[in-house]
Amino acid sequence: MTNIKIILGSTRDNRLGEKVFNFVVEEASKNPNINVEGIDLKDYDIPFFNLAMNPTYMDNPGYTGDTDKLSKKIDDADGFIFVMPEYNHGYTGVLKNMIDTFYNEWRLKPAAFVSYGGISGGIRAVEQLRLVLIELQMVPIRASVHIPLIFNQIDDNGLLKEEIKEAAHLDATVEDLEWWAKTLKEPRESKLK
């Protein structure tokens, strides 16, 4: 079974991203070929990156606490979906810090994106994150979902509107991610032994 971790890259109070995150976790879980686990960064106390050396050059950085727990979850994954807002034409600082804290855990794994924001729907944040993930030897897939004007996409019950869910075509993105995760798994395990 393919393990997909869905990471919510916002920790703000009253964040709209939690609604998007719950939708993505629920929809991705409908795919019978993958195990899905949601990771809300708000649940982890990850200190600002402060290792003496870049984790790129370390086999065992000696993580403790929540950092160690998150390292194991990321290492266990075959692929990722980043659910993320756009802040000032970029992705969030909390997401950048979490990504930079790890290296080997990310290597040779695919990533998909579900972004949300104002008029752009978070596209600019995704474009920036793609560049960073390539440096980590990840494979950002082309398929992605962007939800514009997120503040107008919430219904009276505080949930993501049904028409937005249908228009997202998230299932196609999940299927692409599943294919990439399966395709990369054996070569990744062989190379990283």
Where does each model-flagged region fall?
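Short alpha-helical linear motifs
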Residues: 119, 151-153, 188-193
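N-terminal beta1-alpha1-beta2 submodule of the flavodoxin-like/Rossmannoid cofactor-binding fold
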Residues: 1-84, 89-97, 160-179, 184-193
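Short, glycine-/small-residue-rich phosphate/pyrophosphate-handling segment
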Residues: 107-150, 164-168
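A short small-residue
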Residues: 1-6, 110, 148-157
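Mobile beta-alpha loop/short-helix "lid" or hinge segments that flank ligand
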Residues: 37-50, 136-157
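Alpha-helical structural signal in soluble globular domains
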Residues: 23-31, 101, 105, 132-135
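A generic structural signal for secondary-structure junctions
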Residues: 53-54, 103, 134-137, 182
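Rossmann-fold NAD(P) dinucleotide-binding segment
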Residues: 92-108
